[in-house]
């Protein structure tokens, strides 16, 4: 199993991401594509024995570069791979894949919501259903020729021996961690949107005003159900 992720200033989430997948796949290789983080992301990746690959977009958030990486980073592998953002935790184990005949894992995803006003990731137990995150995170690279992710990897048009698992595995997207943290992250990403992203409408939600972000968070908290 090889796991690929893309990071920019993910010092909060990256340790949890690595621990989550190493627990499920003890011998996995984790490859971190880092977009020149300015916090401790790079040190964390190297300190936790990940392969670190740095790429530059001139300090701009570039969805086209993001897609180029995710559509190609796994090529050349002959086993299962996971391609996920640092806040996307697929709940699947090594034993689940040992006898899986399908080439792509089916997913039922939830946006995780912190009911408390803290940054305790392990304490987040609630979520709201999010069909847009039913992504093709996990697939068998020996059977898939191209994954052909679309914008944000929310859709894909794979080629090769394409078959989806009958069982759906839960994916947890840690979106609503903390109101202040979410507002601050949105502001950072809004300031980094490339001209291409702006013209194509990619990442438009990052430009939402703080009050709108807060209300979105509180609505999610109100509707969240216990998952863990």
Where are these regions (language model features)?
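Active-site nucleotide-sugar/metal-binding loop of Leloir-type enzymes
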Residues: 67-80
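A conserved acidic beta->alpha catalytic loop
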Residues: 33-44, 57-59, 85
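Short, acidic, metal-binding catalytic loop of nucleotide-sugar glycosyltransferases
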Residues: 19-28
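Conserved donor nucleotide-binding strand/loop of the catalytic core
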Residues: 46-64, 139
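Short beta-strand-to-loop acidic/aromatic patch adjacent to the donor-nucleotide binding site
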Residues: 78-91
């Amino acid at each position: 199993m090889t796991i690929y992720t893309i990071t920019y200033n993910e010092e909060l989430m990256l340790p949890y991401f690595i621990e989550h997948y190493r627990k499920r796949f003890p011998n996995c290789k984790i490859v971190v594509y880092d977009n020149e983080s300015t916090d401790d992301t790079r040190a964390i990746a190297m300190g936790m024995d990940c392969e670190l690959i740095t790429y530059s977009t001139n300090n701009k958030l570039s969805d086209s570069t993001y897609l180029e990486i995710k559509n190609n980073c796994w090529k050349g592998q002959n086993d299962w791979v996971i391609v996920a953002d640092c806040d996307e935790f697929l709940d699947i184990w090594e034993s689940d894949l040992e006898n899986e005949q399908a080439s792509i894992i089916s997913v039922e995803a939830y946006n995780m919501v912190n009911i408390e006003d803290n940054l305790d990731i392990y304490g987040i137990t609630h979520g709201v259903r999010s069909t847009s995150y039913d992504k093709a995170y996990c697939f068998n690279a020996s059977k898939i020729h191209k994954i052909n992710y679309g914008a944000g990897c929310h859709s894909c048009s794979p080629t090769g021996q394409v078959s989806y698992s009958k069982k759906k595995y839960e994916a947890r997207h840690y979106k609503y961690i903390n109101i202040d943290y979410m507002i601050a992250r949105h502001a950072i990403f809004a300031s980094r949107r490339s001209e291409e992203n702006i013209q194509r409408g990619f990442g438009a939600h990052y430009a939402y005003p703080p009050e709108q972000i807060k209300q979105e968070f509180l609505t999610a908290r109100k509707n969240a159900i216990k998952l863990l």
